[in-house]
């Protein structure tokens, strides 16, 4: 019996290791054939890291944790290798974005074992772990452009694991770990923190409704618990104000929803689709249908399996279902919906753990097969991703510095995402056209505007702009 138990444990850890390695390899393959980093806004990360290493501050206002991690990795690579500094920074960003998000499998692994009491079948375990890191959000969308999104999902899963442990064991140290994981999420990505904040509110409300007597009894056992929990709740409420220190613009955007909460339903995704004002390609439409189908299914399954669960399990699962429905709700603002839809794979992954634990085989097996096929398709089609600019464009963009007088007191404006490449290659202050007002122009000796000719979606060139340089791939205009 002992040998059998050891073998089962070895198989589970083998699956954990294998899925983690597959995730790292797939994420590395996405960037392996690129002279820099593929994706539209991917140069944002090396640029921020370079600013940290050279000046000790970020070049653009943002929550800092990911850039701190990447800067530390870059510093180590610079010290132990002969690679040029720029190459070391780019390599560090690639490495961090490949390895850290793949660590998601660890909290998901232990959460799965805890929910299933270490009795889950290896095949189901493999599907759950694969769903956590090989899904379209983490593997495709967040593989190259969105380091912060992918890494913050790791901290969200950590929060869910420790919250699950606390809801079952009521140990204060687990509540401390919840608080720490929430803080890490906030310092990594505002969107994921906002989504996690919603879940914590839902979980607190559901727990208060269905388990108030047990909570009161737990508090009576130790007076210090009341103080600690009150302090934790106060800290959670005040956490969003920490965002103001790093990104005042996002903080003001968050506050606007408290003054006008109904704006979240304006220009909803569902309404724009019905009016024919929004078009999606078939892949995104299929993704939407799959997510919302699972959302509806999770509600139905709750009423079928809740009697097989204890009170804590039922509360946690119901909170996940409500969270999942809120994140995948097509009746909210389209811009918000597009972001939340991809984060909704977090509750889907954890809900799947409960489905495999409490549903019967006729339900478990088809779901496992469907998920396995979808994940296989995702991995098979992930592949190598292209950069925002070609090698030839990169070389020409770099050469523009020779035609810019007084670069230290010049700002070069560009279309969104191109400004990061401009600042990286020219080592010059850069921004978006809409981000600099005309009354701010006198701060600089000159204000330039660079146009990438291959971009199919060009902004309108300012009427007062004069062409000062034209090349094969870029035109340079003077605005002021």
Describe the residue ranges of each PLM region.
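Membrane-interface helix-loop-helix junctions at transmembrane boundaries of multi-pass membrane enzymes
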Residues: 5-11, 119-120, 169-172, 211-227, ...
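Transmembrane alpha-helical segments
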Residues: 134-137, 355-357, 365-389
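Hydrophobic/aromatic-rich transmembrane helices and adjacent perimembrane loops
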Residues: 149, 194, 332-361
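Membrane-embedded helix bundles of polyisoprenyl
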Residues: 19-24, 46, 66, 93-115, ...
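Start-transfer (signal-anchor) and selected internal transmembrane alpha helices
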Residues: 1-29, 225-230, 369, 480
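Short periplasmic/luminal acceptor-recognition loop of GT-C membrane glycosyltransferases, typified by
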Residues: 376, 386-394, 401-458, 467-479
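Short hydrophobic/aromatic helix or loop-helix immediately within or flanking a transmembrane segment
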Residues: 58-86, 185
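Transmembrane catalytic cores of multi-pass membrane glycosyltransferases
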Residues: 23, 27-31, 62-63, 147-148, ...
């Amino acid at each position: 019996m002992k040998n059998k138990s050891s073998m089962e444990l070895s198989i589970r850890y083998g699956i954990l290791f294998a899925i983690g390695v597959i995730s790292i390899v797939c994420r590395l393959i996405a960037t392996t054939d690129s002279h820099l980093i593929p994706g539209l806004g991917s140069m944002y990360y090396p640029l921020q890291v370079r600013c940290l290493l050279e000046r000790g501050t970020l070049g653009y206002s943002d929550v800092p944790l990911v850039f701190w991690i990447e800067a530390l990795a870059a510093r180590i690579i610079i010290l132990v290798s002969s690679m040029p500094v720029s190459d070391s920074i780019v390599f560090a960003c690639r490495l961090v974005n490949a390895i850290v998000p793949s660590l998601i499998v660890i909290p998901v692994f232990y959460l799965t074992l805890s929910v299933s009491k270490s009795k889950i079948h290896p095949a189901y375990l493999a599907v759950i772990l694969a769903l956590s890191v090989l899904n379209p959000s983490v593997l495709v969308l967040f593989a190259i452009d969105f380091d912060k999104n992918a890494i913050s999902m790791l901290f969200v899963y950590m929060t869910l694991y420790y919250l699950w442990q606390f809801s079952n064991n009521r140990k204060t140290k687990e509540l401390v770990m919840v608080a720490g994981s929430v803080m890490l999420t906030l310092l990594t990505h505002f969107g994921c923190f906002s989504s996690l904040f919603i879940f914590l509110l839902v979980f607190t409300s559901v727990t208060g409704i269905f388990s108030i007597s047990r909570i009161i009894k737990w508090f009576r056992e130790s007076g210090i618990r009341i103080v600690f929990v009150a302090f934790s709740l106060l800290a959670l409420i005040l956490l969003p104000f920490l965002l103001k220190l790093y990104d005042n613009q996002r903080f003001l955007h968050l506050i606007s929803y408290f003054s006008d909460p109904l704006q979240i339903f304006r220009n909803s995704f569902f309404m724009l689709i019905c009016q024919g004002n929004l078009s999606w390609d078939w892949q995104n439409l299929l993704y939407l249908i799959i997510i919302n189908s699972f959302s509806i299914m999770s509600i139905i399954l709750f009423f079928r399996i809740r009697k097989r669960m204890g009170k804590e399990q039922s509360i946690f699962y119901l909170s996940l279902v409500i969270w999942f429905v809120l994140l995948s709700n097509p009746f909210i603002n389209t811009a918000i919906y597009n972001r939340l839809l991809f984060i909704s794979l977090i509750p889907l992954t954890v809900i799947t753990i409960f489905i495999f634990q409490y549903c019967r085989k006729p339900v478990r097996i088809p779901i496992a097969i469907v998920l396995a096929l979808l994940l296989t398709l995702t991995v098979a089609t992930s592949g190598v991703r292209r950069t925002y600019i070609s090698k030839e464009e990169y070389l020409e963009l770099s050469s523009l510095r020779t035609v810019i007088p007084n670069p230290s007191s010049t700002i070069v404006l560009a279309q969104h995402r191109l400004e990061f490449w401009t600042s990286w290659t020219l080592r010059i202050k850069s921004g978006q056209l809409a981000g600099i007002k005309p009354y701010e122009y006198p701060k600089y000796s000159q204000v330039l505007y660079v146009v990438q000719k291959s971009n199919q979606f060009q902004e309108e060139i300012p009427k007062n702009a004069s062409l000062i340089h034209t090349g094969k791939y870029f035109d340079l205009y003077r605005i002021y």
